[in-house]
Amino acid sequence: MIDYIIIGIIAFSILVSLLRGFVREVLSLGSWIVAFIVASQFYPYLAAYLTQIESMYIRNGTAIAILFVLTLIVGAIVNYVISQLVDKTGLSGTDRVLGAAFGLVRGALIVAALLFFMDTFTNFEQTDWWKESQLIPHFGFIIEWFFQQLQASSSFLTPTLNQ
């Protein structure tokens, strides 16, 4: 049962990315990352102009929301323009195939994250359908690799993470 859900999540991600194309997917992801950075770094500057809001928390939250949404809108416009250029150059077939590959990787990462949280915060790993899954062990490898990379590159994680 869980294997069908895993396949469904990955297939859906592939289909969405196939339809949207690699350029749109990457620019969309980049827009979200940039929006997060812009909102988290520049909200104090906008909050200083929102003096009509008395609560500092609401003022800061409003500034964050405004910056985040505006950055996403600018990202969507840039995404649209660049996507139109890709379509005009005749690279849409290649763009869609690369998009499907992007969707496969994204789907696998989404499934790995879901399985990690289910394993860590629930008792699903003790159920029969979890134990009988043919696919879950493969995602265990991805999760382990991810935490090894984090451990190797982060000063916050000590080498005793896996011990």
From Swiss-Prot:
Domain of life: Bacteria
One Pfam short name: Colicin_V
Membrane-topology descriptor: Multi-pass membrane protein
Key words, A-Z: Cell membrane, Membrane, Transmembrane, Transmembrane helix
Single Gene Ontology BP annotation: toxin biosynthetic process
Membrane-crossing residue ranges in chain numbering: 2-22, 26-46, 62-82, 97-117
InterPro entries: Colicin-V_CvpA, CvpA-like
Subcellular location(s) per record: Cell membrane
Main location: membrane
GO cellular component, one term: plasma membrane
Family: To E.coli CvpA.
PANTHER family in alphabetical order: COLICIN V PRODUCTION PROTEIN (PTHR36926:SF1)
The protein's name: Colicin V production protein homolog
Organism: Haemophilus influenzae (strain ATCC 51907 / DSM 11121 / KW20 / Rd)
